[in-house]
Swiss-Prot record:
Residues 30-62 form the LRRNT domain. Residues 29-527 are extracellular. The keyword Manganese does not apply. Residues 409-503 form the Fibronectin type-III domain. It comes from Xenopus tropicalis (Western clawed frog). The gene is flrt3. Keywords: Cell adhesion, Cell junction, Cell membrane, Cell projection, Developmental protein, Disulfide bond, Endoplasmic reticulum, Glycoprotein, Leucine-rich repeat, Membrane, Repeat, Secreted, Signal, Transmembrane, Transmembrane helix. Disulfide bonds join 31-37, 35-44, 309-334. Residues 305-356 form the LRRCT domain. This is Leucine-rich repeat transmembrane protein FLRT3.
Length: 648
């Protein structure tokens, strides 16, 4: 091919390309004046806008509209024609309904911190490609979400509804959801149907709600076969939820609940679990072998629980000592008995567990006989019942015995006051049973008083009551339950009356940390420190007074020898510097400085020659061109002579 032919071909190609792309430049929209455009990113945020500006370029992909005052009426209909927009930031605006007229291909929508109350199918059906929907910090309630509102959003993966007004989990969520955040709402119940279709869910956050064990369906989590993280922090659970999905669960957060019991099979089959947190609960002991199935456990946090390091916790010490170094366990520090309080379980020797005699000499024994007739049982974890208390004087030696009748079951209770706020309870039963109801109330009256109840399983033989009133009487009762999970005939309780120890008998420290236990001993040295500090302060004041007296005395002698500096006024400095006229330095006296005429001609009224009074040392009071260079007078920054070098 010749050079001329090649050049002609290139020219035609350039011409065709120009005709091909020129319409795009002709039709391109300029950036709105109130916004800034950078390629496909349109920045209209933080401008106090009440509506979305028109004229957004067609090639826009991301709209930044946050921190304005845009309301629902401020979303124009032409916004829907922006087919390339995939991401919109509309948080911190004034929306009160789910916005419409949004681009149909948007995949990520941020609507946090508005006042959105309703979510309708009509609004969500306009964005069928949505993948991430952020609705945190709004006013969405369960009744304000239309049934089936999400049925067309088959690509939705992330749904954030934190800090709203939900009381239940919305029904009909798409099964494609992988992460669901519902923390800090008002959810008290979760029906099994709510989550049964979310088989792809990987992360579920339910922190800060009103959930208890009765509000969770028995199989509510079983279908979540792909769940890897479950968080139930800051709820009202009394034990870990049952039937956790064991296939893929890796993280389980249960801290800041009301858990006082952990069933032996609570974590059965959770072979993939590597992080478990049960801190800030009321757990006193752990059943042996509870962690046997946790083959991948590497992080176990059990801080701030009132661990009772009795014989039943000896296995925990042996288990801790057998763990490999990669397993990190934190928070297993004893609070009771008193002899081991503040010590970590791992550091205890077997003698400190006192497995031969777990109850001290000051225990109280109660034996009672119960009948074999049965009544229907109540819920497994009853809610505590509170009544008006009527406290009577304590009588810790009183023993209750029922009238001897044909014996079917015998229960023996032993109690011991461990600290000013805790009472240790142990019991023995003659026959195996499913569970026992344990209750305690402030005062002696079986009718009046603040009553708290809980259910303990039949395999347990001890319990630690915590957070009690110091030096107060308590009535502790137990009712056995048959294997049929129903109460015995007349619900005759096994009761004992005791009281917590007085404050003076125990160290006031109730924390689990050794450093905090040492604080009372630090306080005992306060009087000695105060005496030493007072003595040092007194000596310092005395020395300061002597120094002041000495300076004052020497200053008086010096002032008598240097009379020229006495009575000097500050304004003399200004007079010497020539910055202020001071008539007091020009004295007209008949005896010392008479005014002498220059000649004998009559002196007119306005012609006078006044001689300046010079100081004895010959230094002129006013500057002149001759003396300025030879003067030894020192000046401050303001041009005023220093008083240490000027004399009057």
């Amino acid at each position: 091919m010749s050079t001329e032919t090649w050049n002609l071909f290139v020219a035609w190609a350039q011409l065709l390309l120009l005709f091909r792309i020129s319409p795009q430049y002709v039709n391109a929209k300029p950036c709105p004046s109130v916004c800034r455009c950078d390629g496909g990113f349109i920045y209209c945020n933080d401008r106090d806008l009440t509506s979305i500006p028109s004229g957004i370029p067609d090639d826009a992909t991301t709209l930044y509209l946050q921190n304005n005052q845009i309301n629902n009426a401020g979303i124009p209909s032409d916004l829907r024609g922006l087919d390339k927009v995939e991401r919109i930031y509309l948080y911190r605006n004034s929306l009160d309904e789910f916005p419409i007229n949004l681009p149909k291909n948007v995949k990520e929508l941020h609507l946090q911190e508005n006042n959105i109350r309703t979510i309708t199918y009509d609004a969500l059906s306009q964005i069928p490609s949505i993948e991430e929907l952020h609705l945190d910090d709004n006013s969405v309630s369960a009744v304000s979400i239309e049934d089936g509102a999400f049925r067309d959003n088959i690509f939705l993966r992330l749904l954030f509804l934190s800090r709203n007004h939900l009381s239940t989990i919305p029904w009909g969520l798409p099964r494609t959801i992988e992460e669901l955040r519902l923390d800090d709402n008002r959810i008290s119940t979760i029906a099994e149907i709510s989550l049964q279709d979310l088989t792809n869910l990987k992360r579920l956050v339910l922190d800060g709600n009103l959930l208890n064990n009765n509000g969770l369906g028995e199989r509510v989590f079983m279908n979540l076969i792909n769940l890897t993280e479950l968080s139930l922090v800051r709820n009202s659970l009394t034990s870990p939820p049952a039937n956790l999905p064991g296939t893929n669960l890796r993280k389980l957060y249960l801290q800041e609940n009301h858990m006082n019991y952990v069933p032996p099979n609570a974590f059965a089959d959770l072979t993939q679990l590597y992080r478990l947190d049960m801190s800030n609960n009321n757990i006193t002991a752990l059943p042996q072998g509870i962690f046997d199935d946790l083959d991948n456990l590497t992080q176990l946090f059990l801080r701030n629980n009132p661990w009772y390091c009795g014989c039943k916790m000896k296995w925990v010490r042996d288990w801790l000592q057998s763990l490999p170094s990669k397993v990190n366990v934190r928070g297993l520090m004893c609070q009771a008995p008193e002899r081991v309080r503040g010590m970590t379980i791992k550091d205890l020797n077997k003698e400190l567990f006192d497995c031969k005699d777990r109850i001290g000499s000051n225990t109280i024994h109660v034996t009672t006989t119960v009948l074999n007739s049965l009544l229907p049982a109540q819920g497994q974890w009853p809610v505590p019942v509170t009544k008006q208390p009527e406290i009577r004087p304590p009588d810790i030696n009183k023993i209750f015995r029922t009238t001897p009748i044909p014996v079917k079951k015998i229960i023996t209770i032993q109690v011991k006051s461990i600290t000013t706020e805790t009472i240790y309870i142990s019991w023995k039963v003659a026959l195996p049973m499913t569970a026992l109801r344990l209750s305690w109330q402030l005062g002696h009256s079986p009718v009046f008083g603040s009553i708290t109840e809980t259910i303990v399983t039949g395999d347990r033989t001890e319990y630690l009551l915590t957070a009690l009133e110091p030096e107060s009487p308590y009535r502790i009762c137990m009712v056995p339950m048959e294997t049929g999970n129903i109460y015995l005939s007349d619900e005759t309780p096994v009761c004992i009356e005791t009281e917590t120890a007085p404050l003076k008998m125990y160290n006031p420290t109730t924390t689990l940390n050794r450093e905090q236990e040492k604080e009372p001993y630090k306080n005992s040295s306060l009087p000695l420190a105060a005496i030493i500090g007072g003595a040092v302060a007194l000596v310092a004041i005395t020395l300061l007074a002597l120094v002041c007296w000495y300076v004052h005395r020497n200053g008086s002698l010096f002032s008598r020898n240097c009379a020229y500096s006495k009575g000097r006024r500050r304004k003399d400095d200004y007079a010497e510097a020539g910055t202020k006229k001071d008539n007091s330095i020009l004295e007209i006296r008949e005896t010392s400085f008479p005014m002498i005429p220059i000649n004998s001609d009559p002196i007119s009224k306005e012609e006078f020659i006044i001689h300046t009074i010079f100081p004895p040392n010959g230094v002129s009071l006013y500057k002149n061109s001759h003396s300025e260079s030879s003067s030894n007078r020192s000046y401050r920054d303001s041009g005023i002579p220093d008083s240490d070098h000027s004399h009057s």
